A protein has these predicted regions:
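Short, polar loop motifs at secondary-structure junctions
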Residues: 1, 58-64, 77, 96-99, ...
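N-terminal beta-loop-helix "entrance" segment that forms/cooperates
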Residues: 1-10, 69, 121-126
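Glycine-rich, highly charged phosphate/nucleotide-binding loops
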Residues: 4-21, 128-138
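Glycine/small-residue-rich loop that forms an oxyanion/phosphate-binding "nest" at active or ligand-binding sites
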Residues: 17-78
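Structural motif
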Residues: 27-28, 89, 149-150
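Internal active-site segments that recognize and position negatively charged phosphoryl groups
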Residues: 78-111
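Histidine/lysine/aspartate-rich catalytic loop segments that bind and position anionic ligands
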Residues: 102-133
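A C-terminal functional module that forms or caps the active site or interfaces directly
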Residues: 124-166
Length: 166
């Protein structure tokens, strides 16, 4: 629990956030956004500069592969598609990004996409709208029920989302 006022989102970019900082006479901005929310962090730093306040960034450590883990890192979507060729039932936990590729799914694959909100799937993919954190038993059940053979995720750290790695 934080012993201060907490406000979440909806500022209208860096300019809107800077205006809010000035109006509320805020003297310290704490950026505790998701590790891959680069635009929000950029706006926070810019707004802090525009309004003359300090901006502290809270960053959580990335996950670290353990003995026996089979992690593969890819540079971009094209490399990911190549890396997925031997797999048949991937689970994507990348948010909305894979939605743009629903019509590119190879015949040999069926994708499960998990995002915060539900979106339409198609004959080659299901989209699950769900917000974590998820319990390890829930994750294991999802993998078993859907016969998931590979997980695609960004390394965002956090013990709250780590059960999907187990």
């Amino acid at each position: 629990d934080l012993h201060c006022q907490v406000r979440v989102g909806g500022y209208g970019g860096a300019q809107g956030l800077a205006q809010y900082i000035r109006e509320q006479r805020i003297d310290l901005l704490l950026d505790a956004t998701h590790p891959y929310a680069a635009q929000i962090s950029q706006n926070a730093a810019l707004a802090a500069g525009l309004s003359g306040v300090l901006c502290w960034a809270l960053r959580r450590p990335a996950w670290v592969a353990q003995t026996g883990d089979d992690w593969r890192e890819v540079a971009d979507w094209a490399h990911l598609v190549q890396a997925l060729k031997p797999f048949h039932r991937p689970l994507f936990t990348l948010g909305r990004e894979p939605l743009a590729h629903r019509d590119e799914i190879p015949e040999s694959q069926f994708w499960t996409l998990r995002a915060l909100d539900h979106y339409p799937g198609n004959e080659r993919c299901d989209v699950i709208g769900a917000r974590g954190p998820f319990l390890i038993d829930e994750e294991r059940a999802l993998f078993e029920q859907r016969r998931i053979d590979v997980l695609i995720s960004k390394n965002s750290g956090s013990s709250a989302t780590e059960p999907k790695l187990e």
